[in-house]
A protein has these predicted regions:
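One-carbon transfer enzymes
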Residues: 1-253
Length: 253
């Protein structure tokens, strides 16, 4: 495979697990990065969940620190700002990737000749939006990851499909295990997607099919529904093995 064209990365300008681990994965995969755009912190006023699925109080190096050490160009700027648009138009990138971002504007997406890759922690289109691990449990959906070329406007978690992969749930899993396994799969699939379409002689975005169904976009799980999560998780975990025992999901699992 030929070397990928230099990549533009959308990241957060504060310590963030996916940003940190994603930059290291891309670097170790030998994928050149033309620019990392770190968005400043914004307070979102989202209700704090009563049931946590992610580890707490972990420390990560910031994107700026990683880029300084690896010699990667870095700028701190809001992703949808006029300054970012101007920088991207001058750079004329082929492919971008999201390692930390809010919703990107259509004007930003249009700066890329192929598109912007996102790794979503749920199976699209049936599990769009937020709290994907929890919604999958509550609705009886498979856990999984989807890589896609994002669409603009109101089509959040849609666009063009690159790959979908079901993530297994093991008999002794906790919610934290499932969450971390999904995050690990996101990074593996993100690098694979960049390698597949990042080559300047490789596939164009138009070659990837749009999603046939829009599915449903869901916000955070409401408290009155979330209170059923732990009880349903035990049933969900036991049922996953029964449903998939005849379908091998990979020797590592």
């Amino acid at each position: 495979m030929a070397s990928p064209a230099p990549l533009v990365v959308f990241a957060y300008d504060f310590p963030h697990k996916k940003t940190y681990e994603g930059l290291l994965r891309l670097h170790l995969a030998g994928i050149p990065i033309a620019l990392v755009i770190g968005a400043p912190f914004v307070q979102l006023h989202i209700r704090e969940s009563a049931i946590r699925v992610a580890p707490a109080k972990l420390q990560f190096l910031s994107a700026r620190h990683v880029c300084d050490r690896l010699g990667i160009p870095y700028v701190r700027e809001a992703h949808n700002s006029p300054e970012t648009v101007a920088a991207l138009r001058e750079l004329a990138p082929r492919v971008g990737v999201v390692l930390g971002a809010r919703i990107l504007s259509q004007e930003i997406i249009d700066c890329f000749s192929v598109g912007v890759i996102n790794a979503h922690p749920g199976l699209i289109p049936e599990n769009r939006g937020l709290d994907n691990v929890k919604w999958a449990i509550l609705l009886g959906l498979d856990q999984g990851v989807t890589t896609h070329l994002i669409a603009g406007g109101k089509d959040v978690d849609l666009g063009r499909l690159i790959e979908r992969q079901v993530v297994p749930v093991l008999p002794d899993d906790t919610l934290l295990d499932v969450h971390l396994r999904i995050q690990n799969t996101e990074l593996e699939m993100m690098v694979r997607a960049v390698e597949e379409i990042g080559d300047a002689r490789g596939k164009c975005g138009i070659e990837f099919p749009p999603f046939r169904d829009r599915g449903t976009y869901r916000a955070c799980v409401p408290p009155e529904i979330e209170e059923r999560l732990l009880e349903q998780f035990r049933e969900y975990r036991d049922g996953w093995r029964s449903k998939n025992q005849r379908e091998p999901v990979g020797e590592d699992w």
